[in-house]
Amino acid sequence: ESAGLMPHRRYWGQLDRATFAFGYGLMVTPLQLAHVYATIGGFGIARPLSITRIDPPVMGTRVMPESIVHSVEHMMESVALPGGGGTKAAVRDYRVAVKTGTAKKIGPDGKYIDKYVAYTAGVAPASRPQFALVVVMNDPSNGSYYGGAVSAPVFSQIMGDVLRLENVMPDGMPQGAENLIVMHDSHPQGPAL
C-alpha cells in the first residue's frame, strides 16, 4: 500500500491550507480514506484497519474530540439530504453521512488535464455507524464526472445492499414504522458450512 502524501503541519503555508480545504494538496489511497471515515464513524476512535469483523472488538485510540466528530458527521449527513450535493448517495430508510468529491487529474507535464477522479465516502447508519465505504471512479466517461452524480449512486447501491444483508435496523424511518419491518435471521441454525 502506498504511504500517501500529507505534508507535516509545520510546513503548511497559506496556500496549502486553502487547497487542503477543498481536498487538493494531499494524496491518500481509498483504503486510507475508508480508515478515516471509519474513525469518524467510531466517533473519533481510531482502530486497526480490518476488512472483516474482529470479534471481540479491538480497543482504539481517541484521535478526535467526540464533540467535533458529531458536528462533522452532522454536516456530512446533510450532504445526502434534499438540497445537498450528494442526494444520490441516500439510502432508503437509512440515514447516511457522506462527502462527495471531484478532483482534476494531473498530466505528465504536471499541469491539470480534462480528466477527473470522482469519489463518495461515508458511513451508515448515521445514528450508530457500522460500515464505512469509499467509492472512487477514475476518469468517469458517461458525460458527467462529479462525485455527487457518478460515484454517489454506486455508494447508495452498495451501502444499501450491505445494510440490508447485514440486517441493520433502519434509522431513517418515521417513529413507529419499525413495527412494519420483517427481519430475517441469516443463520437460523448456525453458520452455513
Regions found by a protein language model. Name each.
Residues 1-137, 147, 190-193:
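Beta-lactam-recognizing serine transpeptidase/beta-lactamase-like catalytic domain environment
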Residues 57-60, 149-193:
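Short, gly/Ser/Thr-rich active-site loops of penicillin-recognizing serine hydrolases
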Residues 140-150:
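A short acidic/glycine-rich loop-to-helix N-cap element
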